[in-house]
Regions:
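Intrinsic disorder/low-complexity segments
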Residues: 1-31, 65-90, 462-468
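Conserved nucleotide- and phosphate/pyrophosphate-binding catalytic cores
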Residues: 6, 72, 217, 223-467
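N-terminal Rossmann-like or analogous alpha/beta NTP/dinucleotide-binding catalytic cores
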Residues: 13-15, 29-36, 41-65, 85-197, ...
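Short helix-capping/linker segments at secondary-structure and domain boundaries
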Residues: 65, 158-164, 199-208, 377-385, ...
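Extended, compositionally biased low-complexity polar/Lys-Gly-rich tracts
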Residues: 87-114, 211-212, 300-328
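Flexible, glycine/proline-enriched loop segments at strand-loop-helix junctions
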Residues: 173-182, 204-216, 331-333
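Aromatic- and glycine-enriched pocket-lining scaffold segments that form the walls
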Residues: 191-195, 199-227
Length: 468
């Protein structure tokens, strides 16, 4: 795992967009929205992965506008779904889900032999778990090279201190001793992650990252990087007009102390050196408001879209030993697990330590088996398990067996879909290739816009052409 990573256990993936007030909320609700999330390719997925991320992805993919044309809340706490007057049955979100294979290199560069195979295994589970290439764009990060180009450009404007202060970066350096994490790729992980996200923003379209509360700070880092990029390359001034308006020029200089002694001949270089720094310090909107008389000579356009977090509720999925479910702990149930293995593994699950003897009553609220009952069992079985535990009316072995029955019933259709894709691995590769082409079409449009904002080649070509 890395700093701000697309992780094995949960996706990354913010605060409000900053466009306050009721009118701002209504305006956002009318916008179309894209959803973006991904995972590092760690191979086959376990049920913790499913309920921690994949289940929410499938839900967002399948959400459609009802007959009123107003979408339901979909469980979001920050970025709610867009409310649009469109035909019933239309998807609420345009979903992009990917496998972050480049991110694996930040911590596992010493051995890359398993990345391709793990990526295929993970995509197979994406499909078995319910993601539909007809409804979502499913792609592989490394097949969209524009991610690397945008990462490069964003890295040029990202202060080193922003990356060094990321909490998970410091934690990883302190806690992960078996890997060498002192490399640029690991430090710059949040910048690549930002590129992954904002690549799929569009004009007039909200960009949403489903995330848990512990991952919101990662999206906020992306928002900070985007604001800085937009300030450098989205803030323009009409210098010719400003020079002709003495009052506006004086207003401009008075708000930037470093410009007060500058002559009009020096104003262009002085502007470039100071005004964008002021806009970064004050915030772009405050900066424009402070300009007062000179405000009309400034323009601002967002070259990249600031992402928003969609806080998603995820159920507790403890591992077989009661700790967080993780492959590294060996306490998982895979989506591909056989019935026999499920029964064997669940038979030795930890339970409420108070139930040392069959006759000892327990507390289902502290029992991992009961947590799993809440995921897979019917209400009738859930009530039976809770009552039996509290009264010692049932034993833990009996409770585990009943839970395993419901788990097997739930996992069987997922496993059957997986087996079908395993028989035809070329179909999985086809999904990856086709989805990556679709993602790249969007990415190429983004990069054309970004390149022009940074370098201005099209503007320069027009100037050259007009002078011939």
């Amino acid at each position: 795992l890395g700093a701000g990573t697309w992780e094995e256990e949960h996706p990354v993936t913010s605060r409000d967009t900053g466009k306050g007030g009721e009118s701002g909320s209504k305006a956002r609700a009318l916008q179309k929205a894209r959803v973006l999330s991904g995972m590092r390719p760690t191979g086959r997925m376990h049920i913790g992965n499913y309920f921690g991320a994949l289940a929410n992805w499938v839900r967002l993919q399948n959400e459609v506008l009802p007959s009123s044309g107003v979408a339901s809340q979909a469980g979001a706490q920050h970025a709610g779904p867009p409310q649009r007057k469109e035909a019933a049955g239309q998807p609420v979100y345009e979903c992009f889900y990917f496998i972050a294979d480049w991110h694996s290199l930040t911590s596992d560069f010493a051995d890359t032999s398993g990345i391709a195979g793990n990526s295929i295994e993970m995509m197979t589970d994406y499909l078995a778990g319910g993601l539909d290439p007809a409804k979502s764009v499913l792609f592989l990060q490394s097949l969209v090279p524009e991610h690397a180009e945008l990462h490069l450009l964003l890295s040029m404007v990202t202060p080193l201190g922003w990356l060094e202060r990321v909490p998970t970066y410091k934690e990883a350096l302190e806690n992960i001793k078996h890997k060498d994490l002192h490399n640029y790729g690991f430090l710059g992980y949040p910048v690549l992650q930002c590129a992954d996200i904002v690549m799929y923003g569009g004009s007039g379209m909200r960009l949403i990252v489903p995330t848990g509360e512990d991952q919101v700070s990662h999206v906020e880092t992306s928002r900070e990087i985007v604001r800085r990029f937009n300030t450098f390359f989205g803030l323009e001034v009409d210098l010719e007009g400003l020079r002709k308006n003495k009052a506006a020029m004086e207003s401009f200089k008075n708000h930037l102390p470093s410009l007060r002694g500058a002559s009009t001949e020096d104003i262009e270089s002085a502007y470039r050196a100071n005004s964008k720094a002021a806009a970064m310090e004050w915030g772009i909107r405050n900066f424009l408001d402070k300009m007062e008389a000179s405000k009309e000579y400034f323009s601002y356009s967002e070259k990249l879209t600031e992402p928003e977090s969609m806080l998603t509720k995820t159920p507790r999925v403890p591992g077989l030993d009661g700790r967080k479910m993780s492959k590294s702990y060996g306490n998982t149930i895979m989506l591909s697990e056989s019935d026999a293995d499920i029964r064997a593994k669940t038979k030795v699950m930890v339970t409420d330590p108070a139930r040392k003897r069959r006759t000892d009553p327990g507390n289902p609220d502290v029992c991992p088996v009961y947590d799993w009952h809440k995921l897979f069992s019917t209400k009738e079985t859930l009530d039976w398990a809770a009552q039996g535990c509290r009264t010692a009316g049932i034993g833990c072995i009996e409770c585990k067996a009943k839970m395993a029955d419901h788990l097997i019933a739930w996992i069987t259709p997922v496993r059957e879909r997986r087996v079908e894709f395993e028989r035809h691995p070329a179909r999985v590769l086809e999904v990856i290739d086709n989805g990556s082409k679709r993602a790249r079409n969007v990415a190429q449009g983004t990069m054309a816009r970004v390149r022009e904002a940074v370098f201005g080649w099209e503007r320069k070509r027009k100037v050259v052409a007009s002078g011939e």
